[in-house]
Amino acid sequence: MSYAIFKHGGKQYKVVEGDIVLLDKMDKEPKALVELVEVLAVSKEGKLSFGKPFVNGAKIEAEVINEGRSKKVITFKKRRRKDSKTKRGFRRDFTRVRITKIVA
């Protein structure tokens, strides 16, 4: 089983061909092809190769499925005996992609 670890938007993801991953919003149309070139590590046929910081010649090809927004996350702070409270909500914009090919 071959897998790859790549970096996108300040986060690291471990993927296998066929995986569906939620990445930060990329402003791409559905069915568009995306190349992810910041590959940190690749495992092919039992051989693991690490990059310094990225693996030379390695890339991940993915297809955009759709875009969306996550469920709202509520942040609530209350200070006791102060009659002070803060409530904020946050929804992450994401792009859902399917990993089609790992090139090493």
From Swiss-Prot:
One of its GO terms (biological process) is translation. One of its GO terms (molecular function) is rRNA binding. SUPFAM superfamilies: L21p-like (SSF141091). InterPro entries: bL21-like, bL21-like_sf, Ribosomal_bL21, Ribosomal_bL21_CS. PROSITE patterns: RIBOSOMAL_L21 (PS01169). Keywords: Ribonucleoprotein, Ribosomal protein, RNA-binding, rRNA-binding. GO terms for cellular component: cytoplasm; ribonucleoprotein complex; ribosome. The keyword Ribonucleoprotein applies. It comes from the Bacteria. Part of the 50S ribosomal subunit. Contacts protein L20. Belongs to the bacterial ribosomal protein bL21 family. This protein binds to 23S rRNA in the presence of protein L20. HAMAP family: Ribosomal_bL21 (MF_01363). This is Large ribosomal subunit protein bL21.
